[in-house]
Each structure stands twice: as C-alpha cells, then as structure tokens.
Amino acid sequence: MAESVAHPSVLNATEEDIKQLLAASCHIGSKNLDVRMENYVWKRRADGVNIINIGKTWEKIVLAARVIATIENPADVCVISARPYGHRAVLKFAAHTGATAIAGRFTPGNFTNYITRTYREPRLIVVTDPRADHQAIKEASYVNIPVIALCDTDSPLAHVDIAIPTNNKGYKSIGLVWWLLAREVLRLRGALSRTAPWDIMVDMYFYRDPEAEREEEAKAVEAEAEAPAVEAAEFEPTAEGAVDPSILAAATAGQVGQSAWDEEGDWNTTGAAQTSDWANTVA
C-alpha cells in the first residue's frame, strides 16, 4: 500500500511510520466516497468500507509539512479543530511548532470581521475535518488563505488546497497524523534530527476523555481508602486515676534530693527555698 513517491529518499516513510499509520487505523475510511477522493482510495472492502492508500497519506503529510515550514513566522499558521478528538492534538501541535491553535467552536468572523477581538490574519490554516470546520474554510476562501485539511473518503474538498487522506473520525488516527506533521515540520526547520527519535510520545496527541480521567481518579482514591491503616503501637491502658509508671519515671528523672510530687504532708509548713541575692553578685 505504501507506494514510492516523487520527493527525495530522505523524506520517505520508514517501516515504523507505516506500522504506526496502520496501527492507528489511518487507512480505514468510511463507506461513502466523494468523487474527488477517489484517487486516494486503494480498494473497497467487501463490507463497503473504503481503504485509504497509506503511501499517499504520507506523501501529503510531507507536502503539508514543507508548506508549513516555509512560513517565516510560525504564529501565522492557524491550526483548527472543532471536533473534540482533535482539541488536544492541535494544542500540542501549536505548543511544539509555535502555531496558533483554535480548539473548539470557531467564532464566525475570525478571518473576515476585523472589529471582533478574535480577528486574525493567518497566512495558512490547517483543519482537522473539512465538514466540522466548514466555517473556517469558508472564511479562508473569502480572504485567500490556503487550507490544509485532514480528509476522510467522504470529506468535501471545496476550497481545500492540500488534502491529507486519513481517517479523521478516530482519536488515534487524528492524533498520529498531527504528531507526524509536527515532527516533519520540526525536521524541515532543522530543530529535530532525522537520525534521532523524537522524545515526544505520540500518546501526548491523543484525545483524553475527561469523564474517564475522573473515574480513574475516583478509583485511585477508593483504593487508597481501602488500603490497611498503619497499626498503632500496642500499649496497656491504666486504670482511671492511676499514673503510668513509665511517665512518672520520665517526669522525675534527674530530680535527686527532691521530694516526690505525690508525697503526703502539709505543703504550707514547708518554707520556700533560700535564693541568692543576684543584685549583690558582681560579674
């Protein structure tokens, strides 16, 4: 499925890259097929699911990375994702490459209404899903902003300049494509060597369900509560009103020649101890 492409051999996908794309189900398309996406489909399964050509997926990832790397100011690249599965991916991509991220709802007028506080003038936008991010693509077409999009087999390609064919409905496939794109951009900029592996794990780009995280935290708290408590030191309780001999010994330690505190007798008949006159003492 991974066909040879026209770019230099140094930009070719490695066996590990192809395995990652297959493991993340980037090659699994939908049952529907847009006419413009036919060139990216390898074959159609018996159950009607279209299989995307992984070789062309990698080719478009490299092409998109080369376009992004040509932008002098990284902040002029705007990465957008209205789908929750792409929120974490675009935020991580922006953090690693210096791009501007819009995760969540795209406010209409961001690219066309200069009166709004969120007005931006990017030189390039990258979207996760042309269908979910249609408002951003539509406004970009009004102001001549190039568009790069992650496209499934049923995605509309209107106003999309570079389509990266992939499964844009799974959180693993979305996160992996954004991770590969960020890594390739850093390599083209010279910030990352091609011989050394990237220390950022692909899992950092995957979507995480907040509800699942809360459940894991709750389970951890319950596990700590069920853990056996530390056993207290054993001691023998004394009768009410009695004095523990060990405590009495510690209290009277070093008091040689002094009467016991519980000695019977009339304390009023005993005079106070003689004190020295400190005023007459000469230093």
From Swiss-Prot:
GO molecular function, one term: structural constituent of ribosome
Domain of life: Eukaryota
Coiled-coil region list: none
Compositional bias (Polar residues): 267-283
Places the protein is found: Cytoplasm
Statement: the UniProt record of this protein carries the keyword Oxidoreductase: no
SUPFAM superfamilies to which the protein is assigned, alphabetical: Ribosomal protein S2 (SSF52313)
Chief location bin: cytoplasm
GO cellular component entries: cytosolic small ribosomal subunit
Residues annotated as transmembrane: none
Family annotation (InterPro entries): Ribosomal_uS2, Ribosomal_uS2_CS, Ribosomal_uS2_euk, Ribosomal_uS2_euk/arc, Ribosomal_uS2_flav_dom_sf
Keyword field: Cytoplasm, Ribonucleoprotein, Ribosomal protein
Region (Disordered): 254-283
Gene Ontology process terms (BP): cytoplasmic translation; ribosomal small subunit assembly
PANTHER family registered for this protein in UniProt: 40S RIBOSOMAL PROTEIN SA
Assigned protein family: Belongs to the universal ribosomal protein uS2 family.
Quaternary structure (record): Component of the small ribosomal subunit. Mature ribosomes consist of a small (40S) and a large (60S) subunit. The 40S subunit contains about 33 different proteins and 1 molecule of RNA (18S). The 60S subunit contains about 49 different proteins and 3 molecules of RNA (25S, 5.8S and 5S). Interacts with rps21.
Function comment: Required for the assembly and/or stability of the 40S ribosomal subunit. Required for the processing of the 20S rRNA-precursor to mature 18S rRNA in a late step of the maturation of 40S ribosomal subunits.
Protein name: Small ribosomal subunit protein uS2B
Primary gene name: rps0b
